[in-house]
Amino acid sequence: MIRVGNGFDVHQLVEGRPCIIGGVEIPFAKGLKGHSDADVLLHAVSDALLGAAALGDIGKHFPDTDERFKDADSRVLLRHVVALLKAKHYNIVNIDATIIAEAPKMAPHIARMVQHIAEDCDILADCVNVKATTSEKMGFVGRGEGIAAQAVCLIQKYQI
């Protein structure tokens, strides 16, 4: 059985927080606001994977009302999601993700983001694609108020 998942996340940019995207701390004057480390890319990827396996979303598994997830490393959360998929006998076929941001520039960091996602998902880097775009100065992203990310994944059930 082959299944597709789609994930989306958005976080506000604020002063006094690190800007962590795809598990990479990006030098920038602002960071993403959230209960965890607010890694918008890994949250979108996690939601896509959970959705593909019909396991709900990250809010269900890592609620922002639970202090255990305060400032949590989203790479740890992603690895937990992958363990849930493996428990249901799913392999990840591929992940394709898009970061939507006016700033900071993502291009210098994308290779490391891909590597982190591949490592955390236990798949080859060739199976992960991350790209970035802007919103052409429109909306909250265009005004530099936040960053969004979306992800799609393909998973496949394997025989045991």
From Swiss-Prot:
It is an enzyme of class 4 (lyase). Binds 1 divalent metal cation per subunit. The record marks H35, T134 as: Transition state stabilizer. The gene is ispF. This is 2-C-methyl-D-erythritol 2,4-cyclodiphosphate synthase. Pathway: Isoprenoid biosynthesis; isopentenyl diphosphate biosynthesis via DXP pathway; isopentenyl diphosphate from 1-deoxy-D-xylulose 5-phosphate: step 4/6. One of its GO terms (molecular function) is metal ion binding. Belongs to the IspF family. Its cofactor is a divalent metal cation. Involved in the biosynthesis of isopentenyl diphosphate (IPP) and dimethylallyl diphosphate (DMAPP), two major building blocks of isoprenoid compounds. Catalyzes the conversion of 4-diphosphocytidyl-2-C-methyl-D-erythritol 2-phosphate (CDP-ME2P) to 2-C-methyl-D-erythritol 2,4-cyclodiphosphate (ME-CPP) with a corresponding release of cytidine 5-monophosphate (CMP). A divalent metal cation binds at D9, H11, H43. It catalyses: 4-CDP-2-C-methyl-D-erythritol 2-phosphate = 2-C-methyl-D-erythritol 2,4-cyclic diphosphate + CMP. It comes from Methylobacillus flagellatus (strain ATCC 51484 / DSM 6875 / VKM B-1610 / KT).
